[in-house]
């Protein structure tokens, strides 16, 4: 089919979820073949996908759709490492979004009794906490493990603050070999310089 498309000398190629119905092994092989095939095409290619890895491997720039509106086009590296919106942050895999508000010393996270040394974007903000910013430690903030999820490659602990059962939950990937159980109380530090924030 692609050979017929290129034979017609198109000015633009649109690929709409080209691998959505394929298993992982077949998808990977076809993706490599498609990349080789399209390397000779000099025109623009519009690639629609919900797979971030697929986009990262195949595209130089990206435009995210958020509630039917297109966000500004950005390069893939910027999207992955410096997502500009909450929608973009969710797309690249961030899972922890905590409500906070401006206070003396930075941003106070609602329910967690923690103040992050961040310059607040507004009076009320949403703070995105990458899992890499959560460091389990002997001292620091305390949290209770409310759930343990054993995934294919990782073990994830879902945390809530000891003092507030209604606060927003925090998801952390446990170091290999660390065992925790529901109800355990653990301590952690938070690397504020890795966190992102937006006006709420």
Indicate where each model-derived feature is located.
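ABC ATPase nucleotide-binding domains
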Residues: 1-84
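Alpha-helix N-cap/helix-start and coil->helix boundary motif
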Residues: 52-53, 85-86, 97, 177-180
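Non-catalytic connector elements of ABC transporters
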Residues: 95, 105-200
């Amino acid at each position: 089919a692609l050979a017929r498309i290129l034979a017609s000398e198109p000015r633009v190629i649109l690929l709409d979820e080209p691998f959505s119905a394929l298993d992982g092994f077949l998808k990977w092989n076809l993706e490599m073949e498609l990349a080789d095939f399209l390397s000779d095409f000099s025109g623009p290619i519009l690639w629609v996908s919900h797979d971030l890895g697929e986009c990262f491997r195949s595209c130089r720039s990206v435009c995210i759709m958020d509630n039917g509106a297109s966000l500004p086009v950005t390069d893939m590296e910027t999207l992955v490492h410096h997502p500009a919106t909450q929608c973009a942050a969710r797309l690249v895999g961030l899972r922890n979004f905590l409500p906070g508000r401006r206070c003396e010393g930075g941003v106070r996270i609602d329910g967690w009794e923690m103040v992050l040394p961040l310059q607040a974007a507004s009076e009320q903000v949403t703070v995105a906490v990458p899992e890499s910013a959560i460091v389990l430690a002997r001292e620091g903030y305390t949290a209770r493990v409310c759930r343990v999820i054993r995934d294919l490659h990782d073990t994830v602990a879902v945390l809530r603050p000891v003092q507030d059962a209604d606060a927003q939950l925090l998801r952390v990937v446990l170091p290999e070999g660390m065992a925790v159980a529901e109800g355990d109380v653990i301590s952690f530090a938070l690397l504020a310089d890795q966190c992102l924030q937006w006006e709420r």
